[in-house]
Amino acid sequence: MSYPGYPPTGYPPFPGYPPTGQESSFPPPGQYPYPSGFPPMGGGAYPPAPSSGYPGAGGYPAPGGYPAPGGYPGAPQPGGAPSYPGGQGFGAPPGGAGFPGYPQPPTQSYGGGPAQVPLPGGFPGGAMPSQYPGGQSPYPSQPAPMTQGTHGTIRPAANFDAMRDAEVLRKAMKGFGTDEQAIIDVVANRSNDQRQKIKAAFKTMYGKDLIKDLKSELSGNMEELILALFMPSTYYDAWSLRNAMKGAGTQERVLIEILCTRTNQEIREIVRCYQSEFGRDLEKDIRSDTSGHFERLLVSMCQGNRDENQNVNHQLAQEDAQRLYQAGEGRLGTDESCFNMILATRSFPQLKATMEAYSRMANRDLLNSVSREFSGNVESGLKTILQCALNRPAFFAERLYYSMKGAGTDDSTLVRIVVTRSEIDLVQIKQMFSQMYQKTLGTMIASDTSGDYRKLLLAIVGQ
């Protein structure tokens, strides 16, 4: 179903709610078992995905004597690197090709404020996607956050009472006018799992659909943000993918952002939800909406079969670096399948080690090589994977920055990232944002948005 008065890109029906009398643009929901059907997306890191039976990274045993993942510093940029913000536990660069004058990155502790460093200049010579002016990407290198503790800005509320919260929301919407601040106080301080319980309690207590009531009281970006917060996390990702491919045109950046950054478990749940709620096969929709090497990359991603072993095989990293060089810079033309195979199957810590090995061996950065060998959406997809291997919070910080930079605001991207990362790593995203752009995320949101929409966004990011 669709909600009355909502624009064409409006949200589809939430599972378990009756029709409103308006024809849906999607197949009827399959009553996906939310919220109990999936583990709640609590604060902190993603839950570990169960073993998929997918072979380990190349089948090589981990050699003994190597430090744990993250023990190596990020690969320096050839020709003199900018002073990137450092991650925890990083010391001097290892030996190898050698980069004279490469500075030791300052120590950054997540417990304190961001390190005061100059604005990075991005990857020399590496053309970023077209939305990055001048091809510059202020991208720091640090250990992949999957190996560190990450924290959301929203935690489950203590002494939670779904019926009490439902009553507060009912009073906020009853009579003339709407008490938006009361709605913000509840919604911004409850976890997604708790919001699902409030939604169920509201229907039990009042025999009414909370989402319909909220839609009748809200509009515009505030409505979009509230609806996103009340969607179960997996359903929101599945809906975002469906919305990116339905109708004329395809929002490739949304497909890349979701499929190239989620864990195996999350991707498998998204695939099941997509089928159950929309009656469609995600892989088939990807094949019909994309083509070429970009299609192959996304199909690889939606299998949810990436190796998630956190131990790094440094021998394999050296061999993969050699394979990637020979598939790209070391030959005429490009062996795209080699890039796809390695970047779609290796764990993120393993890819980070491969990037370091590539830099020492080839005396150039792998991200730059991808820019030289690829273009368009497949370039963006491959670089997203590598950027997440280097520093996942920095990738999302960059996406947030460019959603607000310049004239106008990409509110859909702003809402999607703030909502989906709010219980996972938004604390680290805020810290990287400050380091990369010399301003806080809250400051930029406050200057780029207004009204209750701004108040709710700032409440979520913890300003």
Swiss-Prot record:
Pfam families, per the entry: Annexin (PF00191)
Comp. bias intervals (Gly residues): 86-99
Classification via Gene3D superfamilies: Annexin
Keyword Ribonucleoprotein: no
Family matches, as InterPro entries: Annexin (IPR001464), Annexin_repeat (IPR018502), Annexin_repeat_CS (IPR018252), Annexin_sf (IPR037104)
Single Gene Ontology MF annotation: calcium ion binding
Pro residues composition-biased segments: 1-18, 26-38
Keyword Calcium attributed: yes
Keywords: Acetylation, Annexin, Calcium, Calcium/phospholipid-binding, Repeat
GO cellular component terms given for this protein: chromaffin granule membrane; cytoplasm; nucleus; plasma membrane; vesicle membrane
Modified residues (N6-acetyllysine): K208
Chain residue ranges for the region called Disordered: 1-54, 71-153
Region annotation (Repeat-rich region) ranges: 1-140
Domain of life: Eukaryota
Chain positions covered by the region annotation 3 X 5 AA tandem repeats of G-Y-P-P-X: 5-20
UniProt xrefs under SMART domains: ANX (SM00335)
Residue spans of the Annexin repeats: 160-231, 232-303, 315-387, 391-462
Subunit structure: Interacts with PDCD6.
Function per UniProt: Calcium/phospholipid-binding protein which promotes membrane fusion and is involved in exocytosis.
Domain notes: A pair of annexin repeats may form one binding site for calcium and phospholipid.
Family the UniProt entry places it in: Belongs to the annexin family.
Protein name in the entry: Annexin A7
Organism from which the protein derives: Bos taurus
